[in-house]
């Protein structure tokens, strides 16, 4: 016998307000285990006989009663109940897929009943997850055969939810509001509830299932706004969701070709303001930004002009995040020059490639943070620069500036900043771009000789172009045509040689500047060998070891100063 008409929105509202009245409710919580199993079996048999049995008043009553008191059921009994709902829902979806479009509206109500039951069951199983979390064990600790855990069923549950989103369409309902209620409250809401549990996101099938359901809701059912709201709330209240939300948006862009939602989230985040008293939410938003820059740099580049305000945020976690974001964008642009070419307006007077302009701007903002008021931010800026030294691109001007700032940071009041500045100097030496022509050594004397030789050759080559007129040539100038006064045209080989000499001269000049900066830091590093901070001393020793190998002037002074430290260290190891 069919029951009264079922209105999904009303049932969900009553359930939310704890005012749901189940007609002829069965008090399953007062029954023994065998009677409870019989009640669930009645639902299982009815659904197995017909997927539309959920429209039968008695079957629907038993299903609701069993779900309401699922926390009182044995794990295996609860498992049977879940399987019955999933089986009936999946079977009805198969029937819907094979039904003519003109007759599908008749299946709307049973689908809504299944969706209502399933979202309620998910909510309560999650509430009582500790009861259904671990398989039963025997007295000896061995696992009992056939035991069930709620977490193990999640991939199947999410698979059915995804199937529902792929199968249903707007033709099922007479209004968009009814479809929105079905999708947002019966499909998306359980997914949002499940993702609040950090443990589930560590299980790949569950995590991918959550992402798939959310992406299908956005792609096929216009749930972008609801998902955007959910993401912002997740970042606000659940710190563990920072990276997963960025990964979700990446999956949505790559696998479902929907990039706009990620950009909308970034715009909303850019409009937020944080104070120095905020601690949790800026850290979560910052981690989200960093992960977005890793997975979706193009979207971040498009919104970077808005996000840039957080560079000067009162909250240091946001400043830290922007430093990492800029480092990641530099890396992305260096490896993929066409990534942001369309986002920079063309300048007719400047033929510098668009991606180089962006890289220069990001480096400028990044290096500014070496002087930040917060120790953590200064340290992060040095660390990011350290990572950028591994890029194949040379960035000679930025490397020189890094070296200057790293030497200045050797006198920072924070030992953390000093230690990372030393590590940056070591990395700058190990990855320096001045080994292509003359080998990797950085001897000031040798490079000065090379620079002088190149400069002499360059002056001789340029003298031909800039040779001044003699007095006799000046007197006869009026009688000679302008074309006759012009210097003789250079051959292509001479032009190529002149260009090569100029490049080599710049190359040698930059190398000398680099070595000069390093040598200015040597006396400070000698003093740091006497630091009380062990990590700082070890970093200084590593610097002098590397500097000595590269023949940097003054490195021998550091090596001599640290000999007693090596001896002390060896003795301490012997005593241990």
Model-derived regions: residue spans:
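Extended amphipathic secondary-structure runs
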Residues: 125-135, 164-172, 176, 503-561
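HEAT/HEAT-like alpha-solenoid repeats
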Residues: 226-230, 260-270, 298-311, 336-369, ...
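Conserved small/polar residues in nucleotide/adenosyl-binding loops
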Residues: 574-576
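Hydrophobic residues within the alpha-helices of tandem HEAT/HEAT-like
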Residues: 214, 249-253, 285-294, 311, ...
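Structural recognition of alpha-solenoid helical scaffolds
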Residues: 7, 39-43, 58, 62-65, ...
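Flexible loop/turn segments at the boundaries of HEAT repeats in alpha-solenoid HEAT proteins
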Residues: 51-56, 71-78, 93, 97, ...
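N-terminal alpha-helical scaffolding segments that mark the starts
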Residues: 1-111, 129-137, 170
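Short coil/turn segments at helix-helix junctions and helix-capping linkers
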Residues: 3, 53-54, 76, 108, ...
């Amino acid at each position: 016998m069919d029951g009264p008409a079922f209105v999904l929105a009303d049932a969900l509202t009553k359930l939310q307000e704890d005012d749901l009245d189940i007609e002829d409710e069965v008090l399953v919580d007062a029954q023994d285990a065998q009677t409870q199993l019989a009640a669930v079996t009645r639902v299982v048999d009815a659904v197995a006989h017909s997927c539309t049995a959920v429209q039968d008043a008695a079957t629907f009553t038993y299903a609701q009663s069993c779900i309401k008191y699922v926390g009182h059921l044995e794990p295996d009994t609860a498992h049977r109940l879940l399987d019955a709902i999933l089986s009936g829902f999946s079977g009805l979806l198969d029937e819907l897929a094979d039904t003519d479009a003109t007759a599908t509206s008749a299946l709307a109500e049973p689908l809504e009943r299944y969706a209502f039951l399933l979202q309620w069951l998910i909510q309560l199983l999650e509430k009582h997850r500790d009861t259904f979390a671990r398989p039963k064990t025997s007295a000896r600790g061995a696992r009992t055969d056939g035991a069930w855990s709620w977490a193990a069923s999640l991939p199947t549950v999410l698979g059915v939810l995804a199937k529902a989103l792929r199968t249903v369409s707007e033709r099922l309902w007479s209004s968009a509001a009814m479809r929105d209620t079905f999708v947002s409250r019966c499909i998306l809401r359980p997914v949002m509830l499940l993702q609040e549990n950090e443990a589930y996101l560590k299980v790949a099938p569950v995590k991918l299932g959550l992402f798939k359901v959310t992406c299908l809701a956005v792609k096929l059912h216009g749930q972008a706004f609801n998902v955007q709201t959910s993401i912002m709330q997740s970042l606000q209240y659940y710190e563990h969701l920072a990276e997963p939300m960025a990964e979700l948006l990446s999956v949505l862009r790559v696998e479902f070709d929907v990039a706009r939602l990620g950009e909308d989230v970034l715009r909303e985040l850019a409009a937020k303001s944080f104070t120095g008293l905020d601690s949790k939410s800026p850290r979560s938003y910052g981690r989200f930004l960093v992960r977005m820059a890793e997975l979706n740099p193009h979207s971040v580049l498009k919104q970077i002009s808005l996000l840039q305000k957080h560079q000067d945020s009162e909250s240091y976690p946001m400043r830290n995040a922007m430093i990492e974001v800029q480092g990641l964008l530099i890396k992305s642009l260096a490896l993929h020059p066409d990534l942001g070419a369309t986002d920079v307006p063309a300048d007719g007077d400047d033929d510098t490639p668009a991606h180089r302009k962006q890289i220069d701007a990001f480096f400028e903002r990044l290096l500014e943070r070496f002087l930040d008021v917060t120790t953590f931010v200064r340290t992060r800026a040095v660390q990011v620069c350290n990572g950028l030294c591994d890029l194949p691109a040379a960035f000679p001007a930025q490397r020189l500036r890094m070296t200057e700032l790293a030497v200045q940071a050797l006198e920072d009041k924070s030992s953390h900043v000093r230690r990372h500045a030393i590590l940056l100097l070591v990395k700058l030496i190990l990855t320096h771009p001045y080994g292509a022509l003359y080998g990797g050594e950085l001897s000031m004397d040798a490079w000065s000789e090379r620079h002088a030789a190149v400069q002499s050759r360059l002056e001789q080559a340029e003298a031909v172009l800039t040779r001044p007129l003699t007095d006799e040539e000046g007197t006869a100038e009026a009688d000679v045509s302008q074309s006759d006064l012009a210097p003789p045209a250079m051959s292509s080989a001479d032009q190529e040689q002149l260009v090569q000499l100029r490049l080599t001269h710049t190359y040698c000049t930059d190398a000398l500047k680099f070595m000069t900066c390093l040598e200015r830091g040597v006396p400070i590093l000698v003093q740091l060998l006497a630091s009380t901070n062990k990590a700082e001393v070890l970093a200084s020793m590593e610097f002098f070891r590397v500097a000595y190998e590269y023949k940097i002037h003054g490195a021998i002074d550091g090596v001599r100063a640290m000999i007693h430290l090596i001896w002390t260290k060896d003795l301490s190891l012997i005593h241990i």
